[in-house]
Amino acid sequence: MRKIKDIRPIQLKDHKLYVINQLKLPKEKEWLELSTYQQVAEAIEKMIIRGAPLIGIVGAYGFAIGVKQILDEGRSLDDVRDVFDRLKNTRPTAVNLFWALERVWKKFERWTEEGRSGEELVNLLFKEAERIDLEDYHANKAIGGYGQVLLPERCNVLTHCNTGALATSGWGTALGVIRSAFENGKDITVYVDETRPYLQGSRLTAWELVEEGIPHYLITDNSAGFLMSKGIIDAIIVGADRITANGDVANKIGTYTLAVLAEAHGIPFYVAAPTSTFDLDTDSGKDIPIEERSQLEVKKCGGCDIAPEETEALNYSFDVTPASKITAIITEKGIISHVDKEHITKFLRYRGV
């Protein structure tokens, strides 16, 4: 069994959150201190930290930080709703953020009704955020364990965006499957989509793979289909920002394109995500709000203009892949091999989710 590094993107010290500034990678590994909920919200919005599971975890920590901040300032706990709303409104697509915030909000309501206050209340909220953090890490390890079984002993696997330790509490979802396969001695080569316009593949996934010593090639997004046509790609694994009741998946823009190409070439297309990514209150992908970010992210690269100033750009951050194009969804509870509403509902119910 190979030795794998344990990269962790966030640390909690003295009720302050320290995060790796992912905008500086791969050139510089800079840790930023976040000591107010406003700083946490800004870090999520600016994608200093990103990845659906991680923004949920950071949102939970941000809520605890916000409650402490309000109490330290001598304000009423009625103002805590402002903290919740500010964090909730940072990014609209990833459901993990809303799931984590709802969880800590319900605990906050219960504990205040029980008469918990002051330092005791703050400590309870930080412990709950730490619990969410730890649960995610264990979920990722389980996802990796289940998912690596799907990969042959020798496998060229293509992945999109960043779904590794930097997108989670550690280890990762889709990249966690690859980590687990490599750790277990499989001959894995990873083909990393650069993932325009934010380049999470080239900046973050490639950085993680270098850290781990996992063989990989960085590819342009528009070369994926050609590699499939040449028989180079054996499997595709991506993450998810939201999975609806019928199995449609919202993920980083470009995922749908890969799914269509995978189907055309007979290549298995896997989605790896914790069960907290399922949104059973949303029927299908057409109901998912899709974040549209600044056109400057498309028109600039590395601080340089790459398009005429007069040109307008579209910058949808996510797309939706229909359930019919997904081979299986890998979760910490096991693998959903029939991706439709009936099988998802039964799977989650039988496993106590």
Swiss-Prot record:
Residues annotated to bind substrate: 50-52, 91, 200, 251-252
InterPro entries: IF-2B-related (IPR000649), IF-M1Pi (IPR005251), IF_2B-like_C (IPR042529), Initiation_fac_2B_a/b/d (IPR011559), M1Pi_N (IPR027363), NagB/RpiA_transferase-like (IPR037171)
Keywords: Amino-acid biosynthesis, Isomerase, Methionine biosynthesis
Signal peptide: none
Pfam family, one: IF-2B
Site description Transition state stabilizer, residues in chain: 161
EC number: 5.3.1.23
Taxonomy, superkingdom: Bacteria
Biological pathway: Amino-acid biosynthesis; L-methionine biosynthesis via salvage pathway; L-methionine from S-methyl-5-thio-alpha-D-ribose 1-phosphate: step 1/6
BP terms from Gene Ontology: L-methionine salvage from methylthioadenosine
UniProt GO molecular function: S-methyl-5-thioribose-1-phosphate isomerase activity
Gene3D superfamilies documented for this protein: translation initiation factor eif-2b, domain 1 (1.20.120.420), Translation initiation factor eif-2b, domain 2 (3.40.50.10470)
Function according to Swiss-Prot or TrEMBL: Catalyzes the interconversion of methylthioribose-1-phosphate (MTR-1-P) into methylthioribulose-1-phosphate (MTRu-1-P).
Family membership noted in the UniProt record: Belongs to the eIF-2B alpha/beta/delta subunits family. MtnA subfamily.
Name the UniProt record assigns to this protein: Methylthioribose-1-phosphate isomerase
Gene: mtnA
